[in-house]
């Protein structure tokens, strides 16, 4: 083999590696940006990829109580907390005579 043939082989190797690594990095970044924590009355958190069982956590005591909600509020506009009350828990209005 001559030096010229060796350079051609090495030159072909680098673009092949780049053509494989760059799409893999793009896929990894896309998947990692899609992971979300959804908060509801009874939160269920699970990781889709490791096969761990779903972990049930009790509802938070405050509106937007998880750190994920705090971080999301940095780039989303803030809204007032609107929690609905269960039926029969209306606050009595004091009436003056």
Swiss-Prot record:
Induction: Induced by drought, salt stress, jasmonate (MeJA), ethylene (ET) and salicylic acid (SA), mainly in shoots. Keywords: Apoplast, Cell membrane, Cleavage on pair of basic residues, Membrane, Secreted, Signal. Disulfide bonds: none annotated. GO terms for cellular component: apoplast; plasma membrane. One of its GO terms (molecular function) is receptor serine/threonine kinase binding. Residues 75-97 are annotated as: Disordered. Coiled coil: none annotated. The keyword Oxidoreductase does not apply. Mostly expressed in leaves and stems, and, to a lower extent, in roots, siliques, seeds and flowers. A motif (SCOOP motif) lies at residues 54-67. GO terms for biological process: response to ethylene; response to jasmonic acid; response to salicylic acid; response to salt stress; response to water deprivation. It is found in: Cell membrane; Secreted, Extracellular space, Apoplast. Disruption phenotype: Slightly increased growth and fresh weight. The keyword Cell membrane applies. Residues 1-33 form the signal peptide. Its main location: membrane. A motif (SxS motif essential for MIK2 binding) lies at residues 60-62. Interacts with MIK2 (via extracellular leucine-rich repeat domain); this interaction triggers the formation of complex between MIK2 and the BAK1/SERK3 and SERK4 coreceptors, and subsequent BAK1 activation by phosphorylation. Belongs to the serine rich endogenous peptide (SCOOP) phytocytokine family. Brassicaceae-specific phytocytokine (plant endogenous peptide released into the apoplast) perceived by MIK2 in a BAK1/SERK3 and SERK4 coreceptors-dependent manner, that modulates various physiological and antimicrobial processes including growth prevention and reactive oxygen species (ROS) response regulation. Prevents general growth and development. This is Secreted transmembrane peptide 4. The lineage of its organism: Eukaryota, Viridiplantae, Streptophyta, Embryophyta, Tracheophyta. The gene is STMP4.
């Amino acid at each position: 083999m001559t030096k010229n043939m060796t350079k051609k082989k090495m030159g072909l190797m680098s673009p092949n590696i780049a053509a494989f690594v760059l799409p893999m990095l793009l896929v990894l970044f896309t998947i990692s940006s899609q992971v979300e924590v959804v908060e509801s009355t009874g939160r269920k958190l699970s990781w889709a990829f490791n096969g761990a069982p779903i972990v049930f956590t009790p509802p938070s005591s405050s509106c937007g109580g998880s750190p994920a909600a705090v971080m999301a509020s940095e780039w989303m506009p803030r809204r007032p907390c609107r929690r609905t009350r269960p039926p029969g828990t209306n606050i009595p209005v004091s009436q003056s005579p």
